[in-house]
Amino acid sequence: MSTMTDIGASGALHRTRSKPWYKVLYVQVLIAIVLGVLLGWVSPHLATNPWIKALGDGFVKLIKMVIAPIIFCTVVSGIAHIQDARKVGRVGVKALLYFEVVSSFALILGLIVGNLVPVGHGLAAKPDAGAVAKYVDQASHMSSVDFFLNIIPESVVGAFAKGDILQVLLFAILFGFALMALGERGHRLRDVIDDTAHAVFGVIAIVMKAAPVGAFGAMAFTIGKYGPAALGNLIGLVALFYATAALFVFVVLGLIAKFVGFNIFRFVGYIKDELLIVLGTSSSESALPQLMEKLERLGCSKSVVGLVVPTGYSFNLDGTNIYMTLATLFIAQALGIELTFTEQVTILLVAMLTSKGASGVTGAGFVTLAGTLAAVNPALVPGMAIVFSIDKFMSEVRALTNITGNGVATVFVSWWEGELDHDRLQANLNRTIDPSDVETAITTG
């Protein structure tokens, strides 16, 4: 693969530079987002038309349609290509250790910022408990035992049908080990799975052409339904969350990136296409396949990418972690409830558990917030209605932070494993090798 990706790099780079700006995907998505905002602002009635909403929802469903097969193929392929079974366990342990440490930093950062900048004080909130009843009901059934049992699918077909990432991941790991145990007898099936992965990535390439349409519909509906007035006094929380997420990405993740040997700003620029897609859809899952492919091109080990990225979507949700602690403090402040130091430590410990597997729950961060509040102090639960109307605006930054965090985690674990191609890493981040050329070379190869 490295040979294919090296051939004709300079020629493709020239072609990319000469490509009209309006044909570049991230430019199209950015324009679509701006147009969506304008439509939602100028004509809320038109923007909230079900067909406008369907544009965004439809695009996200198209992406989610291939999430399960992508995860299955990449994880199985990654394990099957490893000759030493101990390596899989080693990579998994390193990834989980990294997730716990960095997730703890995210949770603590949310607590610190929420205490230093108490934007919830003085709101005199009057929450509507009924607005969040369904989320609390979902969260009330979530326990550590239920979470563990939910990882095990009742049937393989059911796991794929529901698109449950953790269940598909478990089956893929078991299948990968079984295929690896077959030795040479399993090589033909392994090659078929590799080819299937390439075909599914081809489907993704086709679907991605509709990304601007999906981003337009999602953004137009959001602005049209909620509008700038919906933020009201809550604009402080939104701004504070944005600033805290940026602080985490460029300082915490920036230090990790510097330790490994790359620049976080260049890395963010490298995955800008994926970030813009996530911004338009508010779903980090919508960019999962493209992120995995780009990380491989960046120089990360295929086996590490196949294990770390899917696992990170359930165990390394940095944006969701920041949101949970920050939103919990905000709700307490708005309701006039003073949380003691012990209660805040309890929030931290509980959130470390409830944040795991958030991607497998409808409502993601909002549902896990319900679980955290219910476990720490039930009196805080009705206050969820305070942030309910602006959760959509914060979900975008949650998703952006999550995908960036998982990207950095994959590079770090690849480096930790000694399987990071530093030359290719620097070449891609410095734009001496254009990502689109590598994609073309892999496809044609």
UniProtKB/Swiss-Prot annotation:
One of its GO terms (cellular component) is plasma membrane. The chain crosses the membrane at residues 24-44, 62-82, 105-125, 163-183, 201-221, 237-257, 322-342, 370-390. GO terms for molecular function: fumarate transmembrane transporter activity; malate:proton symporter activity; succinate transmembrane transporter activity. Pfam families: SDF. One of its GO terms (biological process) is L-aspartate transmembrane transport. InterPro entries: C4_dicarb_transport, Na-dicarboxylate_symporter, Na-dicarboxylate_symporter_CS, Na:dicarbo_symporter_sf. It is a multi-pass membrane protein. Keywords: Cell inner membrane, Cell membrane, Membrane, Symport, Transmembrane, Transmembrane helix, Transport. It is found in: Cell inner membrane. It comes from the Bacteria. HAMAP family: C4_dicarb_transport. NCBIfam families: PRK01663.1. Belongs to the dicarboxylate/amino acid:cation symporter (DAACS) (TC 2.A.23) family. Responsible for the transport of dicarboxylates such as succinate, fumarate, and malate from the periplasm across the membrane. This is C4-dicarboxylate transport protein.
